[in-house]
């Protein structure tokens, strides 16, 4: 069977995930870890390299995503797959500063009590995180919701290439 390591910066989110997945606790190791802290990320290492890694709608919430991509590359086996989804930088962050990384505040879920901070990165910056860490992009999807023609989300499949 698969061995799964799930992490989040928030202990509250980890507690909710453990409760939600209580019947799988013997198959999932839940950890509190900061995606910008290489030491914490590398502590997630198991006996063998991981075959796959997934980040669902988190990259835009991370101040500096470089440590995450660097560590995912280190933790994956050669040929391993990293799939991540994030806000579409062309259509969600409507800004005249598209090429310049910056933060901004917005609502994620209708009715939330206050705006949250997001970190805008251009497509070339997002792809550079992959390329600079030994990944090739072998899949790319732009997802829209509610019949809209403009996509809200990008889903990237990156494959770790063998370095030798």
Walk through the language-model features, giving the residues of each.
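A short SAM/SAH-binding and catalytic strip from SAM-dependent methyltransferases
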Residues: 51-66
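A short glycine-rich, Lys/Arg-flanked "PGG" loop and its adjoining helix->strand segment in the class I
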Residues: 66-81
